[in-house]
Amino acid sequence: MYASVIIYTLVALCGVMSSPVQEAEVAPRAIEPRMPTFADIPFPRFPSHNNHHHNEKDKGKDKGNGKGVDKNNGGGCDTGTNTQLNACSAGSPYCCSSDGNGGHICSNTTACDQKVICCNNNNGFQICIGEIDFNVPVTINIIYD
């Protein structure tokens, strides 16, 4: 008799546990458009760090590397172009820089003065990103023709 009570109890518990329960509906306000919050506000740019730690007394001196005096750059840093390797998985790289009016100027070369390389992936889309300052809002527009 005790065995049958235990078996019937287990069967009843299994039936209760396996019966489906209707989920709560999502409140309509949870999926409606919302106003911008505090986290959506673009804040001003933070000052950049000086990673080279140049002394003011060394600024503009010839360092003996054959590059001469560089008064605009501290400590004799190399001011040459930024020659990029082909980081694209397909297609050819090209250099893009901002024109200051919200647009971009692109050139079909790998010798860049800027550090962002875009890839022409034969009518596909691939983005190769170099050094981007994420202290400012970054917008990537992809226009489908």
From Swiss-Prot:
Disulfide bonds join C88-C118, C95-C112, C96-C106, C119-C128. Induction: Expression is detected in planta up to 5 days after root inoculation. Constitutively expressed at low levels in mycelia in young cultures but gene expression is not detected in sporulating hyphae or in non-germinating spores. Carbon limitation stimulates expression whereas nitrogen or phosphate starvation down-regulate expression. Keywords: Cell wall, Disulfide bond, Glycoprotein, Secreted, Signal. Residues 1-18 form the signal peptide. The keyword Disulfide bond applies. Glycans are attached at N108. Self-assembles to form functional amyloid fibrils called rodlets. Self-assembly into fibrillar rodlets occurs spontaneously at hydrophobic:hydrophilic interfaces and the rodlets further associate laterally to form amphipathic monolayers. Belongs to the fungal hydrophobin family. Aerial growth, conidiation, and dispersal of filamentous fungi in the environment rely upon a capability of their secreting small amphipathic proteins called hydrophobins (HPBs) with low sequence identity. Class I can self-assemble into an outermost layer of rodlet bundles on aerial cell surfaces, conferring cellular hydrophobicity that supports fungal growth, development and dispersal; whereas Class II form highly ordered films at water-air interfaces through intermolecular interactions but contribute nothing to the rodlet structure. This is Class I hydrophobin 1. It comes from Trichoderma asperellum.
